[in-house]
Amino acid sequence: MKLLLRALATFVLLNGVDSVADESFQKCNVTGGPHGKEFDDSNATSRGLILRALRLCGVDFVDGIGVTIWDLSVEENAPFHGLDQNCRDVQLSPYEYITSVEFHSAKIDSETRVGFIRLLSQENKTYEIGKMSNRGKEGISECTAPEGYQLAGFYGRSEDKIFALGALWGPLPEKWPLQG
């Protein structure tokens, strides 16, 4: 019975949207390869967060990614992963939040890494970095936030580039303070 429960828990972690330690957060499947060191923004945020900005780094591939979040418990926090070069900072408009992600993986010098990301807000604004995969559906992952959720950060694997990436969804705030 214990073996069956362990196998089921492993399956849930590797497939579909799953809950993290704080049950108010959910994760999408990770896209990419096994290289680099693990990271997880779920420790850098809490319920009621507001996503204020994105930091997207890279040219032909995704070399770095970060978010700036504001929440009631830590005021402002900006977890960042990968290489902080060739970056574009995107300030979200007040009350804007990310509802959908698309990640493409690519194989370079025998390493699988993230080659392209697209983030879509509820205002139909699109934010992208990298180059789209030409491998068809293979290596492409899309995920939409559950109803009442928004992008809260990321998890995956990185060093001087992003090797694997998944979205972390957090609940929308009950009240939106003025953003400025």
Swiss-Prot record:
Entry superkingdom: Eukaryota
Motif (RxLR-dEER): 52-77
InterPro entries: Jacalin-like_lectin_dom, Jacalin-like_lectin_dom_sf
Keyword Signal attached: yes
GO CC annotation terms, alphabetical: extracellular region; host cell cytoplasm; host cell nucleus
Main location: secreted
Induction: Expression is up-regulated at later stages of infection.
Subcellular location: Secreted; Host cytoplasm; Host nucleus
The keyword Signal is assigned to this record: yes
Residues annotated as domain Jacalin-type lectin: 25-171
Keywords of this entry: Host cytoplasm, Host nucleus, Secreted, Signal, Virulence
Function: Effector that partially suppresses the tobacco programmed cell death induced by cell death-inducing proteins.
Free-text comment about domains: The RxLR-dEER motif acts to carry the protein into the host cell cytoplasm through binding to cell surface phosphatidylinositol-3-phosphate.
Protein name: Secreted RxLR effector protein 19
Organism for this UniProt entry: Plasmopara viticola
Lineage per the UniProt record: Eukaryota, Sar, Stramenopiles, Oomycota, Peronosporales
Protein's gene: RxLR19
